[in-house]
Amino acid sequence: MKTSGLLTILLVTLGAVLCADRPDKPHVLFMLIDDLGWQDVVCYDLDEPCPYETPNMDKLSRKGVMFLNGYSPSPVCSPSRGAILSGKHPARTMNTTVASGKPPAPFHRRGNSFIAPWCRGGMDPKEYTITQALKDNGYTTGHVGKWHVAINHHAFPQPVDQGFDFSTHYPKNQMARGVQSGMKNRLANFATKNPKDPYRLDENGYPYDHVTGEALKFLEKSKGSPFFLYYASWLVHSPLQSRSQVLLEKYCKKLGVDYPTDPEGWTLEGQRNPYYCAMVETLDYYIGQMLTLLETTEDPRWPGHKLIENTYIIFTSDNGGMEGHHLEVFTDN
């Protein structure tokens, strides 16, 4: 009789825990990808078959809301990022270009042909960002990856000056760019399985990315409170490179192109750059790592449920794709 009573109490208690209300403040994971084009994701491909493999991005589109008419506030990086964080048009933040005030370079075919209009050297530290608003409402706020809301990556204010409790963006931290830290020769120095290799290949053959690694740590560490994570990947911005030689070889074969022997440039038009293909797939893999953590981790604020069940995930690009420059074709929008 005593055993039965104890069992009843346990069942009632467990039922009460499992039926606990969803927390009022959901978690937020905001993924802002660098220079990803709208046709660089399979789910948005409209004409010829997209060669890139993006199963995790496509999974988000199937399980969420897919927008077809979204427009960036600016065609370049810094103004668009400042606008997204502040909710204001670049003209209002007075940050309208990547670098302002540079004089023309005479007799230089790649130099500026005019002086860009004046703009602020960085976001106004008094600007009330979405991060500060969430922090004021009890959120733990984190940033990993790229910042660039000014004329360069080192200008004031930095993420911690705009409402972030945590940021990996340290100007002198060589690992701050993660897997996108420049390779001196993109046909050499590929990642290995050596434990001492900072880009060591994991069990699935993908290189370690410091940015994503720090994101995963933040998600795990902050799960006990409502969190806002601004995941600002350096992918798929130039330099075009793949630390996985296997991925580079895979896309050369898939595209029917010869494995490159010259590390400089790529002239084939369209979506036929194997370096870029490898970068897009690598990015997708990192997104999958974060989704897996959310899907498999118990939400301490909502017992019996996973983090993914009470997390808003927003996935977008800062300013759309870059088709290339005078030396190299990246992709085709």
PLM region spans:
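Short, solvent-exposed loop/turn and secondary-structure capping segments
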Residues: Q39-L46, S72, P79-G82, M94-V98, ...
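Hydrophobic h-region of N-terminal signal peptides that target proteins for export
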Residues: L10-C19
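Formylglycine-dependent
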Residues: M94-T140, W147-S242, P260-C277
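Histidine-centered active-site microenvironments of extracellular/periplasmic hydrolases
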Residues: Y52, A155-G163, P239-S242, L293-N333
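Loop/turn elements at helix/coil->beta-strand transitions in domains of secreted/extracellular proteins
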Residues: D24-L29, K63-L68, K135-G142, Q162-D165, ...
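Active-site-proximal N-terminal segment of extracellular/periplasmic enzymes that hydrolyze or transfer
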Residues: R22-V65
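Short, structured active-site-proximal loop/turn typified by the sulfatase FGly-forming signature C/S-X-P-X-R
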Residues: E48-R81, G87-R92, T140-G142, Q162-P171
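A long, amphipathic alpha-helix that forms part
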Residues: T212-L219, L255-T311
